[in-house]
Amino acid sequence: MLRARNRMRRSADFETTVKHGMRTVRSDMVVYWWRGSGGGPRVGLIIAKSVGSAVERHRVARRLRHVAGSIVKELHPSDHVVIRALPSSRHVSSARLEQQLRCGLRRAVELAGSDR
């Protein structure tokens, strides 16, 4: 589970990560990654109404928080990650979500390395 200290809460953090971070698109999610200042790795979720009803959105959010909690220990202390769930995310397994998140993060870090 994603711990409270690793959750992104401020809208400014979301905005900075989405605006300045590297974006990778997977079939069920969009992953934004940005290496900012310290403070521990932070992960934020964006679950739009297009994902489904409130029950479906909360189910997707719980699954993504669990998946993010399993990878947060592998992140650099200054990493900021925002996961935007796409409507198809409500139909896939947690294992598939974790695979897509890991692949998206790996690709974002590679892209950031080639830009610098």
UniProtKB/Swiss-Prot annotation:
InterPro entries: Ribosomal_Su5_D2-typ_SF (IPR020568), Ribsml_uS5_D2-typ_fold_subgr (IPR014721), RNase_P (IPR000100), RNase_P_CS (IPR020539). One of its GO terms (cellular component) is ribonuclease P complex. The keyword Signal does not apply. GO terms for biological process: tRNA 3'-end processing; tRNA 5'-leader removal. It catalyses: Endonucleolytic cleavage of RNA, removing 5'-extranucleotides from tRNA precursor. Its EC number is 3.1.26.5. It is an enzyme of class 3 (hydrolase). One of its GO terms (molecular function) is ribonuclease P activity. Keywords: Endonuclease, Hydrolase, Nuclease, RNA-binding, tRNA processing. Was identified as a high-confidence drug target. Belongs to the RnpA family. RNaseP catalyzes the removal of the 5'-leader sequence from pre-tRNA to produce the mature 5'-terminus. It can also cleave other RNA substrates such as 4.5S RNA. The protein component plays an auxiliary but essential role in vivo by binding to the 5'-leader sequence and broadening the substrate specificity of the ribozyme. NCBIfam families: rnpA. Consists of a catalytic RNA component (M1 or rnpB) and a protein subunit. This is Ribonuclease P protein component. It comes from Mycobacterium tuberculosis (strain ATCC 25618 / H37Rv).
